[in-house]
């Protein structure tokens, strides 16, 4: 998990043990923060490999939103760390991936095709209804341990959705499956 400024400039984006977690931001802002410091959001397979050995089907002790990164214990009393030493991959908060997903087919989201102006005057996307541009999330969140794990994915949220249970982590381009 990363800490970052809220201006998408990357000036205070850090990956530090005990850093303040940045959440409640849209996918685009997390991607911009990572790019500002030479990182990218991980790919689906990149996250799966990096998170291997992390806690599976458990979440953070207390099932509460953590304020800081690293050093957490899961509901089974195990340190929440992967075989590669990555902290908080699973059971802390859903983490945005670079990968596109299928749209949410829930009838309440379906609608006509139209252009949606992206926040920050950065262009538009052509999408169907309210959730036609879905990005994958990985790892699981603090409030539902049974859905957490290195291969756990959610394709429910569109990229301009922001809540406390969604965050991001950055990785070097070669480790993200990006050439």
Q: What is each of the regions a protein language model found here?
A:
Residues 4-88:
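Short aromatic-cysteine micro-motif
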Residues 5, 96, 173-175:
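Residue-level marker of positions within ordered structural domains that often coincide
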Residues 18-25, 42, 114, 118-179:
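Disulfide-stabilized, aromatic/cysteine-rich ligand-recognition loop
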Residues 40-42, 85-88, 93-96, 136, ...:
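Structural recognition of the beta-strand scaffold that forms the well-ordered cores
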Residues 47-48, 93, 100-102:
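Solvent-exposed loop/turn segments at secondary-structure junctions
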Residues 66-71, 109, 114-117, 121:
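Short, charged, low-hydrophobicity "junction" segments
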Residues 98-111:
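Cytochrome P450 core scaffold surrounding the K-helix E-X-X-R motif
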């Amino acid at each position: 998990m990363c800490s970052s400024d809220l201006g998408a400039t990357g000036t205070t984006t850090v990956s530090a043990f005990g850093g303040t977690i940045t959440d409640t931001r849209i996918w685009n802002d997390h991607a911009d923060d990572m790019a500002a410091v030479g990182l990218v959001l991980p790919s689906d397979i990149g996250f799966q490999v990096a998170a291997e050995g992390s806690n599976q089907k458990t979440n953070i002790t207390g099932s509460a939103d953590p304020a800081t990164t690293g050093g957490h214990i899961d509901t089974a009393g195990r340190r929440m760390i992967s075989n590669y030493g990555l902290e908080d991959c699973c059971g802390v908060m859903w983490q945005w991936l670079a990968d596109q997903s299928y749209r949410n087919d829930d009838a309440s989201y379906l609608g006509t095709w139209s252009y949606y102006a992206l926040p920050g005057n950065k262009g538009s996307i052509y999408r169907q209804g309210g959730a036609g541009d879905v990005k994958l999330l990985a790892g699981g969140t603090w409030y539902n341990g049974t859905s957490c794990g290195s291969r756990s994915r959610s394709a429910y949220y569109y990229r301009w959705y922001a809540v406390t249970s969604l965050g991001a982590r950055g990785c070097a381009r070669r480790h993200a499956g990006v050439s």
